Amino acid sequence: MTKAGKHLFLDILHSEGVEIIFGNPGTTELPLLDAFVVEDRLRYVLGLNEVVVMGMADGWAQATGKLAVCNLHAAPGLGNAMGMLYNAAKAGAPVLVTAGQQDMTIRLTEPLLWDDLATMARPLCKWSFEVNSIEELPRAVRRAAKVALTAPTGPVFLSIPGDVLTAMAPEGLDIGEPTRIGAGIRGDANEIAKAAALISQAETPVIFAGDCVANRDAFAEIVAFAEAVGAPVYMEGMANRAAYPSNHALYASTVPRMTPALRSVMQNHDLLISIG
């Protein structure tokens, strides 16, 4: 039995581990909302403003580490969400942002609410693409999920025309399976040895801890390292997440953002160890 694009889209999202779609929809998203009449695996959480739903998706992705989905309405909806999309990009949040596009049959007339959505989103996304057919839909969603969840993680964007969501998939269309790229890396042994020598020779080292410590859930490791080295720890000045427990004895503060204040911190130390 063939399915419409709207149902295939939800099938693929479910298989990618998506649990919630945060959305502020409009007319171009009606096919997707119609699919939720029978959808019982995913929730659609409605927000009254694009800033709100984009922020919710960003927060969900950061808190769970899972792929979040934000559903917006055409060009105005994407435009209204850009500030929060910027935040998601800076935080490295794995969010799939989608926007309903006008039907492909009328896009040459540049109809109301139309714009080049993929180009609009591209500066703030790891990958941005407009789906041009029902046949492209599975591969586009699979690629978007893989890119968003591959380190360094971050938001991706898909523009999905309404007639792609309403089109019936050809018999036997392969919707694929989730794929992931392993993030395991090994540092260069020579460089590690050099760093170890610097640390062992330092008398007053200091540690600056960044967001990636939290993103990798490396709290125990950085605490153990700080205790072994005996170095105070500063978190980055405009952090998205806390990278070090503030109740720990070696926690100092956040990194000052102004040069004079930063200099006053650094002049007390002979080695800066930047982590994450």
Model-derived regions: residue spans:
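N-terminal alpha/beta PP-like core and its mobile active-site loop of ThDP/TPP-dependent enzymes
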Residues: 1-276
